[in-house]
């Protein structure tokens, strides 16, 4: 899982059958982090399904074959910006069920 590799390797699926849109994603050292996001677990949006927001955080370490659940965000939200920095993963802004947010969190 070198960040400087010129080849792609498929990663294991996140442990949720629906997956998530709008997640915060990046790396902290060699560990990948995915947090937050939205999905439609009951039925698809085009069939009138209700969007849900998640606060779940997942990590994937080098050589591992499955994601680990690693805590939760302070609130369920998604669709912000994320940046991997030396200290961890910055999660910047986004929105939740109640509307737009301007919080900034550091996950490490």
Residue ranges and their predicted role:
Residues 1-108:
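Kelch-like beta-propeller repeat domains
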């Amino acid at each position: 899982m070198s960040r400087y590799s010129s080849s792609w390797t498929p990663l294991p699926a996140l442990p949720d059958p629906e997956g998530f849109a709008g997640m915060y994603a990046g790396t902290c050292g060699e560990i990948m982090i995915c947090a937050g996001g939205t999905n439609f677990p009951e039925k698809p949006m085009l069939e009138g399904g209700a969007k849900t927001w998640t606060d779940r955080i997942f990590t994937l370490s080098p050589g591992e074959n499955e994601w680990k659940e690693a805590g939760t965000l302070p609130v369920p939200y998604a669709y912000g910006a994320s940046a991997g920095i030396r200290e961890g993963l910055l999660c910047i802004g986004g929105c939740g069920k109640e509307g737009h947010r301007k919080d900034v969190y550091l996950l490490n």
